[in-house]
């Protein structure tokens, strides 16, 4: 056991996943934070001590809503509140965010899933891909 009593192979798998995604994205981020952002609850249940993305998803959801609201508000000064709300809802919908994860980030192969979720194709589930973007 290492880092917070997580199995060494799980830590290694997470680090390899984070490093591969950082390289693919051509960016630098805190690797431990990226591992957390890519860790599904099912993986953390099988690897006690592993943090999953749920808290980051909570924060990311609020940030996405704020940024999309401000962007739409400034970009469309003639639209009313209802029109802006519809545009924002579409921009931050599961469909839109999972498409970004699938087609732009190619995030599926990097998501750390528990065995059962992985066997059920969790890396391609829209709900999980959406959570990763949030």
Model regions: which residues?
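RNase III-family endoribonuclease catalytic core
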Residues: 2-133
């Amino acid at each position: 056991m290492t880092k917070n009593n997580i199995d060494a192979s799980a830590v290694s798998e997470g680090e390899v996943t984070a490093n591969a995604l950082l390289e693919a994205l051509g960016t630098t981020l805190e690797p431990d934070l990226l591992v957390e952002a890519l860790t599904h609850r099912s993986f953390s249940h099988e690897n006690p001590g592993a943090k999953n993305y749920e808290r980051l998803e909570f924060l990311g959801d609020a940030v996405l809503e704020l940024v999309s609201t401000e962007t739409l508000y400034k970009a469309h000064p003639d639209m009313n509140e209802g029109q802006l709300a519809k545009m924002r809802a579409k921009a931050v919908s599961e469909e839109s965010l999972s498409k970004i994860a699938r087609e732009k980030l190619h995030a599926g192969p990097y998501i750390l899933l528990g065995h059962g979720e992985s066997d059920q194709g969790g890396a391609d589930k829209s709900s999980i891909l959406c959570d990763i973007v949030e």
